[in-house]
Amino acid sequence: MKRLFTLCLAMVMALSLAACGNSKTPTTSSTPADTSVEPTSAGHPAFHVGSNSKQDLTAKDGTEVLISKSTAYDIVYPEASDAQKAIQKDLEQVVADFHKDSNKQEEDANTYYQEFLKSGGKKEEFTPYTFELTCKPLRADNNVVSILFYSYAYCGGAHGSLTTFARNYDAKTGKVLTMKDFGEEVSSLVTDNAVKFINAIQDTDDAFFYDKVKANDESVQSMLETGNFYLSKDGLVLIDGQYLLQPYAAGIVEFTTSYDDLRGKLNDEYTLDGGVTNCVSAMGTYTFDQDGKLTKTESSYDPAEMPKGDDMPEAEGGDSSTSSN
């Protein structure tokens, strides 16, 4: 997918190097999560931060060349135990796949380290490949569970990259929802909404997208793929990742179509009342007023920033770390 283009760019330097080193494959361990957190009074799914997981890969001299760490959420939903089990299993698989994919970069990380030393660098000044995964539940009720994942990768170069992807579940069954599950007319409505914002912004001094777009453009259609959208308290959100429709400096952009605008198109079991239709970016939040004029306001929310502090409570599970040398 084009959303992975950022990570591919960050890895170009490492992949172009010829030398390589060796390190052992780490073993994986996990700390059982604390499942004592009670669901909400309304019987909705409840979440709490689960176990931390960290894996370190080291070169022969003991220097860390790759760090892979994650913090995951655990779901508590006894009212629908089968759905809870299905969702929890999928969440754990997402984390497992993350560490597996991260560790595939072991050879490139060693290569990057060896080249760093050859160029005169000191091992104590080396910055290892770093991969980090965390997530944040954004909607959890008796119909829908939507979780947004933040995946950071540093593979050498001037800066790392951040991608976000989502998981949407049917709260009754635990099934991973696709865009088709929302209703036949939903995809065209949300893409038309995104196109409207993009083209309007391009007519302003901000104009941070590459160019104007059409709804049937491949880049626009890619936002309909599973993982690139989620249901929030405000509506259905399309994720426009770094480098997809705008350069790295513009960060990640999100296009929300409100539940009110989706009324009659979004299947009833997934809808809520109200919501806000907007475009949120590092540049600000864009909306259309009653006259159809594009307006911009400042926003404290940046889709390209990983949650931290009050947004990410401290893990209740223990820290599970592994290393290899």
PLM-predicted stretches and their roles:
Residues 2-10:
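Sec-dependent signal peptide recognition
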Residues 15-19:
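C-terminal motif of bacterial Sec signal peptides marking the signal peptidase cleavage site
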Residues 21-325:
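Compositionally biased intrinsically disordered regions enriched in Thr/Gly
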